[in-house]
């Protein structure tokens, strides 16, 4: 008899979102208490099903248990399965759970006196048992998991064949189940040939995914990979949920029940979602997208979940598109009451696929509704992409009022559940048939075009927590492109140009330019219009649309001079390069064109993140002064002039232009690194180190911080601080692995020169301690992280998508978090106008 063992399992679920795993058997219930935060729940068995396709939640009530853990545990520990009392459960709760488990036999009936006597003399479990944790470790550490899986199955079958002569080495029933699942998944099949794979264990759900680097993967190979993957996870569920002496039949029942119990993981839609934030921010785009992504990454599912989604919280809409799990991925055998383990037919797999897809939609819709009370509608579509076609199998609009009336713990007849939502669906004889997809993710109702209005041209105001977090009360206060207004007018002009073969094209084009730009309030637009008109009239400007557009936006004298200077620098002619731009730059600076005043400051920003962080760090200053943007050409001109001076060894002159760059762009890592180079040439190492400290104190992205540590390592080494240099090298390697080879060579020299001073194994804690001891900031600093997170969330809640995408991508590169990656994927691209 296989009795349930109460056990604790730590599974990382991000910032505390609970995930429920249903463990159901067709003829017995084997429960697993996996929660640190709540007592195990128990339910009674329902009527016995007669076949796989006849199983329903009303016939077999699943027993569910929460799977929770701290996020840190996910990074360090494997799932620990141990027979111990759940510390957070009350004595009464545990007593009830144990009592319920002890009253159930594998047949779901109360023990008779004879059976009680039989249990007293039950056989010892076999010496061999299924060690899933060891298997997971082997395949995730292997270069290719397939040979390891073959060795695993081969060992089981060998011991099975020798069991008559060596009974002590006979594989357990769960081992036989594991071998059968992998064999039926095509592990030993030669065709289709599998590419080289890697097995990864997801941090949030601990499920195993098989990944390959090939993009053009044959469809049949894809199906085989997905089936192998699902077989591995079926082994996982059986291993962590069942006792060592469980039978193959019980393992089949468990996984069949799990596939039909996935909706039981959903919590009531009005139950507040665990939030990573401790503040009182209103629910918005950030919390909804994060919540949906967290659900996708943490729920326990028997098959890989591939889903895309879009949200429009302001209008109460969420759209989700699921990739249907193909019927070919479902198991090739199943347990049927009265028949035992039998092969599945194509019809049975199609029915199972349809049933699973319908339940998955309910689970995801429930999770989306729970993210915010503002969500009123969740659209879900299931599609399947094959080599020849893309089919949609259902489209349904779940509204919050009707959905709240569904009993997610007892769905009953799925067709009745769906009927109230009037879905676009053909559900015939348990099969889903293709239908026309009635909505698409990129529609205006899910992706409003207002989100991509050019930031510098927006007239929208901001208030409340959004304005405070972004350091501005209007969207245009996040602008970074000085040329936006010219680019917008240039686009309009290009659409109005006359055909080149028109005899009066010049006259018509001049009129179009003057009508659209002649009276523009922006002086740079009027100047560009005059420049283009002169070129059209004297014939120096070709009248095709692209040429005119380029001239309008980038045709100023300084930009043209910079293009020439770059070519001369590449030819190692720094003097001539400087002569091309220095006079123009000097004339601007002497005239004070971009000089700061008490009411206006001129700045350059390389990214929206940089602008938002600048707003926050300089909020007090900007209350008194307006920030104006300098042209990219002006900033670049100072850089090129400084470079030409460095090429000629004139450090002081180079430093003057580098200081102007830092004044214009105080958060730009390039400016800081360049001024460090100038100070190095002048042997002013202490000042260079201070500049690097300033860079690291404000670094917000991996590349800037990484190069900051790389340069700091050089100066620490130069001053004899070997351990500090080593710590900086280690930090840089972590942040910018692209230059790992260069840094490794330099570290080798450092080790050879200082064999008695370097530390062989410098752990992260030791690195932090050394950096702090040498007054070197640990980038990104806690203050920078707080500002960054506030700005990221505010920009998404305010639906300023050019800014939000910038923040999200940098956050993803720093964190490497699957949930954040999901948020990034949910941000739609700019619509094509």
Positions of PLM-derived features:
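Long, charge-dense low-complexity segments
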Residues: 12-22, 26, 30-70, 75-499, ...
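Boundary/linker segments of alpha-helical solenoid repeat arrays
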Residues: 101, 105-108, 112, 130-136, ...
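Alpha-helical linker/edge segments of TPR/alpha-solenoid repeat scaffolds
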Residues: 522, 533-544, 551, 605-625, ...
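"A position-specific structural signal for the A-helix of alpha-solenoid helical repeats
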Residues: 527-532, 544, 556-559, 563, ...
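TPR/TPR-like (Sel1-like) alpha-helical repeat modules
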Residues: 585-586, 694-697, 722-741, 747-755, ...
């Amino acid at each position: 008899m296989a009795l349930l063992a109460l056990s604790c399992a730590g599974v990382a679920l991000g910032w505390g979102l609970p995930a429920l795993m249903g463990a159901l058997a067709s003829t017995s219930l084997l429960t697993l208490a996996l929660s640190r935060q709540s007592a195990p729940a128990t339910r009674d068995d329902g009527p016995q099903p007669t076949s796989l396709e006849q199983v329903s939640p009303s016939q077999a009530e699943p027993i569910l248990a929460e799977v929770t853990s701290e996020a840190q545990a996910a990074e360090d520990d494997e799932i620990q399965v141990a027979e111990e009392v759940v510390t957070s459960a009350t004595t009464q709760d545990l007593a009830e759970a144990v009592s319920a488990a002890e009253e159930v036999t594998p047949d779901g009936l109360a023990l008779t006196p004879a059976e009680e006597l039989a249990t007293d003399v039950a056989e010892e479990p076999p010496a061999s048992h299924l060690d899933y944790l060891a298997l997971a470790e082997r395949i995730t550490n292997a270069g290719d998991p397939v040979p390891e899986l073959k060795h695993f199955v081969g060992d089981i079958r060998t011991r099975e064949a020798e069991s008559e002569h060596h009974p002590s080495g006979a594989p357990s029933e769960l081992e036989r189940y594991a071998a059968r699942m992998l064999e039926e998944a095509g592990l030993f099949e030669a065709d289709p040939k599998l590419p080289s794979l890697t097995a990864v264990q997801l941090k949030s759900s601990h499920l195993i995914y098989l990944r390959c680097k090939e993009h053009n993967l044959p469809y049949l190979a894809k199906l085989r990979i997905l089936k192998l993957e699902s077989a591995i996870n079926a082994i996982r569920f059986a291993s962590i949920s069942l006792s060592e002496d469980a039978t193959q039949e019980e393992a089949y029942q468990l996984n069949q029940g799990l596939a039909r119990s996935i909706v039981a993981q959903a919590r009531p839609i009005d139950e507040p979602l665990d939030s990573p934030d401790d503040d009182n921010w209103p629910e918005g785009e950030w919390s909804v997208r994060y919540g949906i992504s967290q659900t996708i990454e943490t729920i326990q599912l028997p098959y890989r979940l591939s889903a895309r989604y879009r949200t429009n919280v302001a209008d109460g809409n969420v759209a989700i598109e699921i990739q249907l799990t193909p019927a070919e991925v479902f198991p090739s055998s199943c347990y049927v009451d009265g028949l035992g383990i039998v092969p599945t037919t194509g019809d049975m797999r199609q029915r199972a696929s349809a049933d699973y897809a319908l339940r998955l939609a309910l689970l995801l819709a429930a999770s989306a509704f729970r993210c915010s009370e503002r969500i009123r509608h969740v659209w879900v579509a299931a599609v399947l992409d094959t080599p020849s076609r893309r089919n949609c199998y259902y489209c349904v609009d779940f509204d919050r009022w009707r959905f709240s009336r569904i009993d997610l713990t007892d769905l009953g007849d799925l067709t009745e559940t769906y009927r109230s939502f009037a879905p676009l669906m053909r559900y015939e004889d348990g099969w889903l048939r293709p239908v026309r997809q009635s909505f698409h993710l990129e529609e205006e109702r899910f992706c409003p075009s207002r989100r991509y209005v050019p930031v510098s041209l927006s007239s929208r105001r901001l208030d409340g927590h959004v304005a405070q977090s972004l350091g501005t009360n209007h969207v245009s206060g996040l602008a970074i492109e000085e040329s936006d207004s010219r680019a917008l007018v240039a686009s309009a002009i290009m659409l109005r140009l006359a055909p080149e073969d028109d005899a009066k094209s010049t006259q018509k084009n001049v009129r179009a330019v003057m009508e659209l730009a002649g009276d523009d309030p922006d002086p740079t637009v009027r100047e560009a219009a005059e420049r283009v008109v002169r070129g059209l009239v004297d014939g120096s400007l070709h009248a095709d649309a692209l040429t005119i557009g380029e001239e309008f936006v980038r045709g100023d004298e300084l930009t043209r001079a910079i293009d020439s200077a770059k070519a001369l620098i590449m030819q190692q002619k720094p003097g001539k390069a400087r002569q091309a731009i220095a006079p123009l730059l000097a004339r601007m600076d002497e005239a004070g064109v971009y000089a700061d005043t008490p009411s206006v400051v001129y700045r350059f920003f390389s990214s929206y993140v940089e602008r938002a962080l600048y707003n926050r760090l300089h909020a007090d200053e900007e209350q008194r002064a307006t920030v104006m943007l300098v042209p990219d050409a002006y900033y670049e001109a100072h850089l090129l002039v400084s470079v030409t001076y460095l090429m000629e060894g004139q450090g002081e002159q180079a430093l003057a232009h580098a200081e102007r760059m830092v004044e214009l762009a105080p958060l730009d890592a390039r400016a800081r690194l360049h001024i460090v180079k100038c100070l190095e040439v002048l042997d002013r190492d202490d000042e260079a180190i201070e500049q690097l400290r300033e860079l690291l104190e404000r670094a917000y992205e991996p590349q800037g911080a990484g190069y900051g540590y790389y340069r700091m390592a050089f100066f620490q080494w130069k001053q004899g601080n070997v351990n500090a240099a080593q710590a900086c090298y280690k930090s840089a390697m972590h942040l910018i692995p692209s230059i790992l080879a260069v840094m490794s060579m330099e570290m080798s020299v450092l080790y050879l020169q200082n064999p008695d001073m370097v530390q062989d194994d410098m752990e992260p804690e030791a690195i932090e301690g050394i950096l702090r001891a040498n007054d070197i900031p640990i980038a990104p600093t806690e203050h920078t992280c707080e500002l960054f997170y506030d700005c990221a969330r505010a920009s998404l809640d305010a639906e300023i998508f050019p800014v939000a995408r910038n923040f999200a991508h940098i956050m993803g590169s720093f964190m490497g978090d699957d949930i954040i990656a999901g948020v990034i994927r949910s941000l739609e691209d700019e619509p094509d106008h």
